Amino acid sequence: MTSTERVLAAIADQPPDRIPLFDSFWAEFVQRWRQEKGLDASADIEAYYGIDIAICVPDETPWPSQAAELERSETGVVTRDGWGAIHRTRSGAHFYQEAGVALADKRDPERLEFEAPEADARYAGFLRSLAHARAAGRCPFAKTGGPYLRTMNLR
C-alpha cells in the first residue's frame, strides 16, 4: 500500500497493511540523529522511518506580513510573529520568552483588523509543503487551528 492508501484505509475502518505512522521532529533532534547515525545533511528522517502522514498548514496568523526578525546578536534573536507577539530566543534554545503581545488591553479585541484570509502569501508555504508531501509519497493532511485554538497568542 502507498501511504495515502494506508491512511485512507485506516480512516475508513478498513485493515491497512500496517498502522499508518506520524511523527514530527525538532530540527535539533534531526541534526543530532544524523550525527549519531553517521548520515549526511540530506538524510530525510521521515523517509528513514517510513512516516506516512504530512501535516500541511497555511499561515493562520492575523498579520502574516508583519512577521519579522527585529534584532539579532550573539546572545539571541528578537522576532515578531504573525500574531503580533514579540519573542526573545536565546542562541541554541528552542523555546522563547514572550516580550510583548498584540492586544495589551484585553478588553477590546473587536478593534483588531486582520489581514485577508484569502491572501496568496498565506498559502505559499502550504502549497510548498503539500507538493513536498506528495513528492515524498506521504498522505497530506490540511489542518486549521489558528483562528480558534491559537487566539491566546493575541493576549
What does each model-found stretch correspond to?
Residues 1-155:
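Catalytic cores of TIM-barrel enzymes
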